[in-house]
């Protein structure tokens, strides 16, 4: 299980931060208000630069996803991996569905 946080830095760009499971366990108990969503996308999908719609964590349940930040760095996520999305401002990130299987993920709002 890989846990990666994306956040907006002082430079208004999105950055990656690897989290250990214990750090994620602390965040995961702070569920915020709003709906838990199941997101489905085709195997080959693309969403240009955008910000996270809210502080949330995204659990990949099937398929593969790639996230790219402004400096060109990319990370790939497979089932069981978690993306903690907190880049609410700035340039944001790109997401891609990769591989041959449709992508399904679970988005859970984070509280403060």
Model-derived regions: residue spans:
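Short, conserved beta-strand element in jelly-roll/cupin
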Residues: 40, 50-67, 109
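Short beta-strand segments in beta-sandwich/barrel cores
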Residues: 36, 46-47, 64-68, 82
């Amino acid at each position: 299980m890989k846990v990666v946080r994306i956040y907006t830095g002082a430079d208004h760009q999105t950055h990656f931060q690897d989290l250990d499971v214990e750090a994620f366990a602390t965040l995961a108990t702070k569920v915020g208000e709003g709906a838990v969503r199941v997101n489905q996308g085709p195997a080959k999908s693309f969403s240009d630069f955008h910000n996270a719609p809210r502080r949330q964590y995204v659990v990949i349940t099937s398929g593969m996803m790639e996230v790219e930040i402004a400096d060109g760095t990319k990370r790939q996520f497979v089932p069981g991996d978690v993306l903690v999305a907190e880049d609410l401002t700035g340039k944001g990130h790109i997401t891609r569905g990769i591989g041959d299987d449709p992508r399904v993920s679970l988005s859970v709002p984070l509280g403060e």
